[in-house]
Amino acid sequence: MQTATEVKDTSRAFLIEWIIDVHRKFRLLPETLYVTVYIIDSFLSLKQIKKSQLHILGVTALLISTKYEEIYPPELKDLLTVSENKFTKAEVLQMEKDILLTLQFDLTAPSAYRFLERFRRVSSIVGHEEKVFFFAQYLQEISLLDASLLKYKASEIAAASLILAAKSLKKVNVWNKDMEKAT
């Protein structure tokens, strides 16, 4: 997925890092983060925006994803507050409309998080599973910052993060027959 904007990879990375911080502050579900980043990247691949519009895109993508994933999404006024009231409610709602129409309401795709959850169920990792999967999830979050990884499938990101986490923590035989079948 390539972006059709003046937005540089570093600007995108700063935005995603800020979204991760806000995501943690509101204690949102992990999948909400992945949906937010998917919305941002999908929108940027289809529409040109100015660098100055990147922040409102991020806030609005987070708003949309929380409506989609969360039982109790944060209120728009709370998202505006963490954005230091840089834009109005009307501006965010207009951006929401623009995103939804541009993406034709296609807001999700299988995420690396979901694949990691699947791999967790079929994995042969014995002992310290929580530590391995927590580390793999952390690696996946880091991967969200790097636009050069957009060319890889979510399943590949999940598999790579799991292998790297397991190898880093000295776990062997991560890939059993069930994992081969799952991937």
Which role fits each region the language model picked out?
Residues M1-T183:
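Acidic, serine/threonine-rich low-complexity regulatory regions at protein termini
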